[in-house]
Regions:
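Glycine/threonine-rich beta-strand-loop-alpha-helix active-site module
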Residues: 168-180
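Gly/Ser-rich catalytic/binding loops embedded in alpha/beta enzyme cores
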Residues: 2-170
Length: 180
């Protein structure tokens, strides 16, 4: 699938293409990885890969997001075997061992994790500029912040890397990036 067509479709439309057999889940995953390669060097939204063997789960073709690529916020995502470094040099190398309810539900919905998004250290800032990974830039204005703490997720979706990404909010972590 070409990147422009891919970036113009939302998660439900991509899942519908998979259900109709017009594109395979593997093709969508490969397209998402190409989108990361094409865009991420400019905005720094994605800070780590999720290998295909870890990100892809066998789900029913009837799952609402069957085959749709998405990105995990690098903060308490609950995917076993996947690094979760929490935007911090202190978290470098930490690997989740247990699966969270969130992780299980994402997998059951058919989402395919292809990477991890940038977040401020421990999610404690309204701007995604961790020392560990560097700043995430707003894809609409490269001179501006992407906000935070879900700035990597917001920038990745806005730039067309994936149609859907894990984000969380306790004090504006989704609302701040969406308002910028």
């Amino acid at each position: 699938m070409n990147l422009d067509d891919y970036a113009g479709l939302d998660a439900l439309a991509l899942a519908d293409l998979v259900r109709k057999g017009e594109v395979s889940a593997a093709e969508l995953e490969e397209t998402a990885r190409r989108a990361i390669d094409a865009v991420n060097g400019t905005i720094n939204a994605v800070v780590g890969d999720v290998p295909a063997a870890e990100g892809r789960e066998e789900t029913s073709a009837d799952a609402v997001f069957h085959g749709v690529p998405f990105l995990l916020k690098d903060l308490a995502h609950g995917y076993p075997g996947v690094p979760c470094e929490m935007g911090s040099r202190l978290g470098a190398g930490y690997i989740n061992e247990a699966e969270s309810v969130y992780g299980a539900r994402c997998k059951a919905s058919g989402l395919v994790a292809v990477g991890r998004t940038n977040t401020p250290e421990f999610g404690l800032s309204g701007s995604t500029e961790p020392v560990a990974n560097g700043p995430t830039l707003n894809p609409w204005d490269l001179g501006a912040s992407a906000g935070g703490s879900s700035g990597g997720a917001a920038a990745a979706v806005s730039a067309g890397i994936v149609p859907i990404a894990h984000a969380s909010d306790a004090g504006g972590s989704i609302r701040i990036p969406s308002s910028i």
